[in-house]
Amino acid sequence: MKLAYWMYAGPAHIGTLRVASSFKNVHAIMHAPLGDDYFNVMRSMLERERNFTPATASIVDRHVLARGSRKRVVDNILRKDKEESPDLIILTPTCTSSILQEDLKNFVDRASIISDCNVIFADVDHYQVNEIQAADRTLEQVVRYYLDKSHTLDQFVTDAPSVNIIGILTLGFHNRHDCRELRRLLKDLDIRINQIIPEGGSVEDPKNLPKARFNLIPYREVGLMTAMYLNKEFGMPYVSTTPMGAVDMAECIRQIKKSLDILAAPILSSKRVDYESYIDGQTRFVSQAAWFSRSIDCQNFTGKETVVFGDATHAASITKILAREMGIRVSCTGTYCKHDAEWFKEQIQDFCDEMIITDDHAEVGDIIARVEPSAIFGTQMERHIGKRLEIPCGVISAPAHIQNFSLGYRPFLGYEGTNQIADLVYNSFALGMEDHLLEIFCGHDTKEIMTKSLSTDISPIWDPESRQELGKIPRFVRDEVKINTEKFARRKGLLNVTVEVMHAAKEALSA
């Protein structure tokens, strides 16, 4: 646990809550002090869902500290069981309440005896893992719980080729759009989708997971532990190549064919779908990215430098797309997923000049300032860094703000995803003629405070000290302060605006 201005991956309980709120009819209870219960607001704002977030805080206050938590936790579990009638309740502490070292597992066991629904305790070490690792672990725990609970399983796989998509969850970066694109891809390949978990799935679904012929893991961050467990227990093959970019799309489809060919029955399907012809047709005619990478517009990027940073899946994929498919130099690429550093290094070692594995945003900012790239591809934090350094940034990974939870269709996976990524890359650079004109006219005059006005009156002149003072005011109120100050100066017949005039205008407005 650490105090930080910015965290790329949140605390462990956020990962558990993301998995719980992705399933249908599952309720999460967090044992937490006030301040740790921000997940409800965050999810409601970003996902813009009609329904309330199914998460409740069992508040740790002075009464709990004095008497102990057992009664309150058990009462909250039973209350939610009665009010919501969920299939499952997941209890999780937060990193703060974990300090109390209470035996919450014992509370869960007690509540399970009385409640009508299933109750489990999120088996996560809140001191050792972050949001991503906790989400991966919680999903595996839920799947394992229900498979163990089903003493007799129908392990007969489907006759037709079928797949489970594991790892699509709430607050994921473009996850819902990616899921739609994966559905389209699998339909084209004549592969039936058996289950999609956790997003939109029921906790009763895991018992049907072994019926599929293989598992598809679109993102390494969540779902890999579940796939490895299913592979160990039921011998289910899995494909973990992310279908992002034309080259990895082709590799993913070939791995899907290989997984299906392990069993004899899918031969019937492979006769109907020619995978190589499908890859060729989609790459040449559906995805415009392959054509665009050979166009004069993309050739304008030759010699441009970029910095890439994000989660392991997106950072590695975008790095390979930039370097391998678009011919853009990646000066530095990195990830905050330190637990997956070995895989990340293996993936991008031939595609970048420099590599960084860190969760310190200041370190990333220093590298960007040193490299001075033409564009950045990163998280919301790199977008802030880019604004400070006046470097354009395309957001390619979580954590992201609300503008990257778009209502429109913007997948990153699949062949439509290649088009979206090509657009993002192209729009993140200053265009060729724009670059030329900026050079001729010495760039945009954005550093200066705008002093133009629609009024026909002569505007008061701002001296250097007052301009500097105005520049310190936050942007969202700066224009209003400027207008009010100039109105005050005109009313007083002043031709110049000084710092003293600014203060006087503020006092007059407050009076």
Swiss-Prot record:
Name the UniProt key words of this record, in alphabetical order. 4Fe-4S, ATP-binding, Chlorophyll biosynthesis, Chloroplast, Iron, Iron-sulfur, Metal-binding, Nucleotide-binding, Oxidoreductase, Photosynthesis, Plastid
What does the record give as its pathway?
Answer: Porphyrin-containing compound metabolism; chlorophyll biosynthesis (light-independent)
The cofactor remark states: Binds 1 [4Fe-4S] cluster per heterodimer. The cluster is bound at the heterodimer interface by residues from both subunits.
The answer on whether this UniProt entry bears the keyword Chloroplast reads yes
Catalysed reactions, as listed in the record:
chlorophyllide a + oxidized 2[4Fe-4S]-[ferredoxin] + 2 ADP + 2 phosphate = protochlorophyllide a + reduced 2[4Fe-4S]-[ferredoxin] + 2 ATP + 2 H2O
Instruction: Look up the record and name the cofactor or cofactors this protein needs.
Output: [4Fe-4S] cluster
Q: Explain the purpose of this protein.
A: Component of the dark-operative protochlorophyllide reductase (DPOR) that uses Mg-ATP and reduced ferredoxin to reduce ring D of protochlorophyllide (Pchlide) to form chlorophyllide a (Chlide). This reaction is light-independent. The NB-protein (ChlN-ChlB) is the catalytic component of the complex.
Q: Which family does it belong to?
A: Belongs to the ChlB/BchB/BchZ family.
Protein name as it appears in the record: Light-independent protochlorophyllide reductase subunit B
Q: Gene for this protein?
A: chlB
